[in-house]
């Protein structure tokens, strides 16, 4: 993916990481081999939870379904992501709150700050709101979903891994997640 993007003229690639209440991002990027890849290809990484990154209040063009109720003080997103193309790199796996996790759930980790777990009771509506935000702030959205190993069980952390050797790719976040769900045995409709 990196070499192809660079051949096509995308030379300002950046790895984006956000904080989580459960996993140390610096440990995760090493254990998941992300750091190896970014180092090998000279891709700089941005850590959105570091103080130098500004989070700005986002005002949607149309009313939110739920985010304004979960965050009555305002919905804040990373300023650095506004106006940037985005390539999500999710994995094929199940999720204890959302059934599966994929491209749309990947935005959950990037666009919402540390208290994003507050949205779990309304997660499906939250994902719709996040897709709306993405479509408004990113000129291009693409996902390459890694199914070389797919996980099932009470994910995303307590997984049973299965070798499946598939890759999915799409500019349609709903479609790629629907295909992933179907491949995992769930009815996406």
Q: Language-model segments: which ranges?
A:
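N-terminal and secondary-structure boundary signal
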Residues: 1-189
């Amino acid at each position: 993916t990196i070499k192809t993007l660079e051949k096509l003229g995308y030379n300002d690639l950046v790895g984006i990481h956000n904080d989580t209440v459960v996993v140390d991002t610096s440990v995760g990027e090493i254990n998941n081999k992300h750091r190896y890849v970014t180092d090998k290809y000279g891709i700089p990484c941005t850590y959105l939870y570091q103080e130098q990154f500004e989070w700005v209040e986002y005002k949607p063009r149309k009313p939110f379904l739920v985010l304004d109720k979960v965050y009555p003080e305002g919905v804040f997103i990373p300023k650095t992501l506004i106006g940037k193309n985005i390539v999500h790199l999710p994995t094929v796996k199940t999720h204890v709150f959302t059934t599966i996790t994929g491209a749309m759930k990947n935005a959950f980790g990037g666009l919402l700050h540390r208290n994003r777990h507050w949205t779990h009771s309304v997660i499906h509506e939250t994902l719709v709101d996040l897709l709306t935000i993405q479509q408004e702030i990113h000129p291009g959205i693409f996902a390459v979903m890694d199914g070389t190993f797919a996980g099932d069980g009470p994910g995303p952390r307590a997984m049973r891994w299965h070798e499946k050797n598939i890759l999915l790719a799409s500019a349609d976040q709903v479609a790629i997640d629907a295909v992933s769900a179907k491949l995992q045995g769930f009815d996406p409709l």
